[in-house]
Amino acid sequence: MTMLATEKNPMIVSMGPHHPSMHGVLRLIVTLDGENVTNCEPILGYLHRGMEKIAENRTIIQYLPYVTRWDYLATMFTEAITVNAPEKLANIQVPKRASYIRVIMPELSRIASHLLWLGPFMADIGAQTPFFYIFRERETIYDLFEAATGMRMMHNYFRIGGVAVDSPYGWVDKCSDFCNYSLPKVNEYERLITRNPIFLKRVEGVGTIGGEEAINWGLSGPMLRASGVQWDLRKVDHYECYDESDWQIQRQEEGDSLARYSVRIGETKESVKIVQQALKVIPGGPYENLEARRLNRGKNSEWNDFEYQFISRKPSPTFKLPKQEHYVRVEAPKGELGIFLMGDDSAFPWRWKIRPPGFINLQILPQLVEGVKLADIMTILGSIDITMGEVDR
């Protein structure tokens, strides 16, 4: 009896750009041998809007509303880097009170970003319950943002030399209440997730990256620290008032998806501690106390000094950038967010180069998914934590 010859052809699957596990308009062309991934080709650019070229045709003040559309889940960091770059270039001083506000707001944004990473990540690997839990705390953070800035997500709050407005009446107390409330909730997530046997089966040993490999690929943020490299720009660059807070860099040695989860959970706790410490020592205290002292002591009292202001001075709409170049970076939730700025004595930047952490971290995806099962792509991509607005710019 003649047997028919068996043919083995690879299967090509297109994942995205509208698949919910892609976390935005990312497309992956995946080549499969049965259930095993043999090749993965990411297709980017669906959300490209020319953000760098837009910056070169706008003043810094005009450009600020645009930057919240990069990483729209952690907008305080994109605003921070946008004002930090011209501040460093022009050597503009920031009052101490404004600097503390510029620590509190991004750390709240970091907590919100990590929470919104955790929920969809768990949903990707089959656990729906945490997705609903995280929105409880995230909504509280957005209420704080709305009270301080008027907007829940696209804040347009940072300014060259400080922030747009001071914290409103009663805001410091509400923020302190949130910190006291949120720490037990993060511990609740850990009890619910970390030792769950099904969760561990899906993430332990999946998508492993070594420390040297992570450095060679230019990874940053939790992706780098989960591979055993103790590198956090808040400690390295000593910007704003982070040196005046007592907190620890979160690091894991394993380099897998579980390690990246552990780093982000640990960072959420540390961010709460940073906010709590900043609220206690912010110059002038709560806004209502500062205003009462100013009214009581008179116009020329020390409570009207530079360090108690929320902005050094409001910049001119035609603020000119000196003819210099500078690279500024901050530790965003996803990694090192940087701006290379070149000025030419005009109100418009000559060059505005963005270093997006999500784009750099995403480079390693094809290597990580090669040889794994198709279902593990969701785990690995979710553990990288990307926002396509930042990746495509």
From Swiss-Prot:
It is an enzyme of class 7 (translocase). GO terms for cellular component: chloroplast thylakoid membrane. PROSITE patterns: COMPLEX1_49K. It comes from the Eukaryota. It is a peripheral membrane protein. InterPro entries: NADH_Q_OxRdtase_suD (IPR001135), NADH_UbQ_OxRdtase_49kDa_CS (IPR014029), NDH1_su_D/H (IPR022885), NiFe-Hase_large (IPR029014). Its EC number is 7.1.1.-. It is found in: Plastid, Chloroplast thylakoid membrane. Keywords: Chloroplast, Membrane, NAD, NADP, Plastid, Plastoquinone, Quinone, Thylakoid, Translocase, Transport. It catalyses: a plastoquinone + NADH + (n+1) H(+)(in) = a plastoquinol + NAD(+) + n H(+)(out); a plastoquinone + NADPH + (n+1) H(+)(in) = a plastoquinol + NADP(+) + n H(+)(out). One of its GO terms (biological process) is photosynthesis, light reaction. One of its GO terms (molecular function) is NAD binding. NDH shuttles electrons from NAD(P)H:plastoquinone, via FMN and iron-sulfur (Fe-S) centers, to quinones in the photosynthetic chain and possibly in a chloroplast respiratory chain. The immediate electron acceptor for the enzyme in this species is believed to be plastoquinone. Couples the redox reaction to proton translocation, and thus conserves the redox energy in a proton gradient. NDH is composed of at least 16 different subunits, 5 of which are encoded in the nucleus. Belongs to the complex I 49 kDa subunit family. This is NAD(P)H-quinone oxidoreductase subunit H, chloroplastic.
